Curated annotation (Swiss-Prot):
PANTHER family: DNA POLYMERASE EPSILON SUBUNIT 3. This is DNA polymerase II subunit B4. The gene is NF-YB11. Residues 151-161 have a biased composition (Basic and acidic residues). It is found in: Nucleus. A motif (Nuclear localization signal) lies at residues 135-142.
Amino acid sequence: MESEKVVVDELPLAIVRRVVKKKLSECSPDYDVSIHKEALLAFSESARIFIHYLSATANDFCKDARRQTMKADDVFKALEEMDFSEFLEPLKSSLEDFKKKNAGKKAGAAAASYPAGGAALKSSSGTASKPKETKKRKQEEPSTQKGARKSKIDEETKRNDEETENDNTEEENGNDEEDENGNDEEDENDDENTEENGNDEENDDENTEENGNDEENEKEDEENSMEENGNESEESGNEDHSMEENGSGVGEDNENEDGSVSGSGEEVESDEEDE
């Protein structure tokens, strides 16, 4: 476990070698200084111990200020506390150069991403002036993921609620349409029944008129038959009267005949008497 911890805390040797050789080339520009492996390991371990001590001292100043994010001012105060004040000016100048380079890189990247985005360029330059807050970012990442997950769940819940409301609305509309259709069908049936009743009434009226016409025709037939009977009775009366007249004529004829007979008898009797 201790060996793994040393490996984890050990600084990258390539970076340590590059930093050391750059400084040595400034100190001895006439010749190239070679670095032994053990010397490189010693530089690496010394830098690690120095960084640990410097970070612990800077953390104390950060706690005194009641902040959770360490700033460059905390590191500067820690260097003064460790009696490295002579390194503050070159450290601050190198830090300003780093800020300018970093701001230029971010501005170029923002301009490439947003060609006409002046506001995006301004915001990127404003964020570049701030130091990196790696610790705070790591703490905020889980909360951001939780917030994103929660917002996603809320969106899904809202979508499901909207779908449920739409389904209920469609069902209600379908029921309303069915009720309207059923009412329309009932109204149509009522209209048809009303029309049929009207037709039945018209047929009844027509039948009534026909019955009235039949009754009138029957009355006319009765009157005609009565008139015919009256005419027949008159004719029979005329016949009886003619028969009576004929009878009276016959009687007169008979009487005349009887008179002639009696006359002839008298004539016969007178003739006999004359004889």
